[in-house]
């Protein structure tokens, strides 16, 4: 009896893992249709008005995410778990916006102290009530869990200042390449990351808010400055400025964050 009980549990786990769509096909189809690339592919906007017409499909996808229990999730590979969490963050954020669209200009219209959209338990995940902050800060950024600062370039907070929403779903098989492309896109986006005429490195507030994420030895890099040095050629076209960044000598300042909704307004 013990053998058959063990067999049943094992079989159930395998069947469950096989049952979940790790290609995230529904979300993939939605973003391919409603995410518009701008600025030579370095940014994106969302056609919320059109996405709203397919809200039933979005809700169906969210229900498939919510159906996954923590024990199933823990049995997946690291890339599968990361792709799941990133897609969940982005899809639940889009759904949050649609609950008020078109009468919304910023995600902060929900409120900061009361109704904070990032702290609101408006969905369930892994068998319990969840928030957007819980996905990002308590799960993806949890020390020792993934130690992957590029998640900041993948999760999208529905704001112009945020790294772009990717025009496809994140999938385990290509996650490394997808995250790296997101990093390159964001660091190449001059309105959000650049070197000024005075040789000052002006970068997104993300690098201020989450400074410690680039100080944990990621890819052998021990600081934010060393990370910028690796991508010096993306931050400026000027060889002298590139040299300054590559040597870690450029002073750093942080740009104001634009919380305007990343909407394609007609």
Which residues are covered by each model-predicted region?
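Interaction/scaffold regions that mediate signaling and macromolecular assembly across diverse proteins
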Residues: 18-86, 90-266
């Amino acid at each position: 009896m013990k053998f058959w009980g063990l067999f049943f549990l094992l079989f159930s786990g395998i069947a469950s893992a096989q049952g979940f769509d790790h290609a995230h096909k529904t979300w993939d189809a939605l973003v391919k249709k409603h995410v518009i690339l701008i600025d030579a592919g370095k940014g994106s906007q969302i056609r919320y008005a059109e996405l709203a017409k397919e809200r039933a499909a979005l809700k169906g996808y969210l229900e498939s995410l919510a159906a996954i229990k923590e024990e199933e999730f823990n049995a997946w590979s690291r890339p599968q778990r990361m792709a799941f969490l990133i897609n969940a963050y982005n899809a639940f954020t889009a759904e949050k916006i649609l609950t008020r669209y078109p009468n919304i200009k910023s995600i902060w219209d929900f409120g900061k102290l009361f109704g904070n959209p990032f702290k609101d338990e408006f969905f369930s995940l892994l068998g319990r009530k969840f928030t957007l902050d819980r996905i990002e800060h308590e799960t993806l950024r949890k020390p020792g869990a993934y130690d992957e600062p590029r998640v900041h370039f993948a999760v999208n907070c529905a704001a112009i200042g945020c790294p772009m929403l990717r025009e496809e779903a994140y999938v385990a098989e290509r996650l490394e390449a997808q995250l790296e492309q997101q990093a390159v896109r964001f660091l190449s986006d001059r309105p959000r990351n650049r070197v000024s005429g005075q040789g000052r490195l002006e970068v997104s507030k993300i690098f201020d808010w989450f400074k410690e994420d680039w100080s944990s030895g990621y890819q052998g890099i021990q600081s934010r400055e060393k990370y910028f040095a690796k991508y010096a050629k993306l931050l400026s076209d000027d060889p002298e400025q590139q040299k300054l960044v590559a040597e870690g000598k450029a002073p750093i300042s942080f740009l104001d964050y634009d919380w305007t909704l990343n909407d394609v307004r007609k």
